[in-house]
Amino acid sequence: MRIQLLSDLHLETEDYTPQAAPGADLLVLAGDIDTTWSSLSLFANWPTPVVFIPGNHEFDGRDIDQALTGLRDQCRHLGIRLLEKETWITTAPDGRRIRFVGTTRWCDFDLFGNEQRPRAMRAANYFVKVMRAMRNGQIFDPDAVRAEALVCKDWLRETLRQTPQADSDAHWDTTVVITHYGPSLRSADPRYGKQPGTASFCNADDDLMPGVACWIHGHLHCRHDYTVSHEAGQTHVVSNARGHGYKHEADHYDGLRCITI
């Protein structure tokens, strides 16, 4: 299965027109496509199925629960498959069953361990102010972000523990995880390195990788393609985030990038 990867297009400000990659079987949108949601219509009637995992900026200035409901409705209308703490199993052209496991997977600020968490959460206050998101009338502050992140992680852990059911619709041969946030410190942006604010972009989810063939993410405005070795073999981690043109993050961006599962 050939999967086209796009994320962090930020079409609310960026002048960019996504194109379908020749020969792709699926398009994955790994979040931060458009804070206004209006550009999601570009992916209606796409020549392949489209899977969308919301990014943090899809919730800017909104109540996150109400926003998720609204996003679901809009994606359903456009024929886009939104995954938030959900799985989707589809059949690849070669007959294999591929399970896609999707969640925004907010940051839990545990990237550098428990002792460094307070510093990481203080650094996150800046990003929270940029988002201006709410939940139940309260600011979606670092404590609220962490609480939701832990719910996402618990769901992800339990889902990845599941075993395929032979000869049923729940059978799968390969698992692909899609999150907006990076799953490992190895996904840190090299421009900024290892600092408290990095925990607002990456999680320490390396322990969840056994059994996962590929982990797709976005959020960091740089591209990644690396392999994590573990007791069960290897996991391919990949991100094709575009970022902002005015920061030169989009220089040499390949919007037709595909990976093969």
Indicate residue ranges for each PLM-predicted region.
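A basic- and aromatic-enriched beta-loop-alpha substructure that forms the phosphate/nucleotide-
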Residues: 51-58, 63-128
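Soluble or luminal CAZymes and related metallo-dependent hydrolases
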Residues: 35, 63-67, 144-156, 197-201
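Binuclear metal-dependent phosphoesterase catalytic core
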Residues: 73, 77-78, 94, 189, ...
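Active-site neighborhood of phospho(di)ester-bond hydrolases with catalytic His/Asp-centered motifs
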Residues: 5-7, 27-32, 51-56, 81-86, ...
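Active-site-proximal loop/helix segment associated with metal-binding centers of metalloenzymes
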Residues: 101-176, 181-192
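Active-site environment of divalent metal-dependent phosphoester hydrolases
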Residues: 10-15, 34-38, 57-67, 89-92, ...
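Beta-strand-turn-beta hairpins that frame and shape the catalytic cleft
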Residues: 1-4, 88-102, 173-174, 227-236
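N-terminal active-site segment of His-dependent metallophosphoesterases
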Residues: 1-52, 59-67, 135
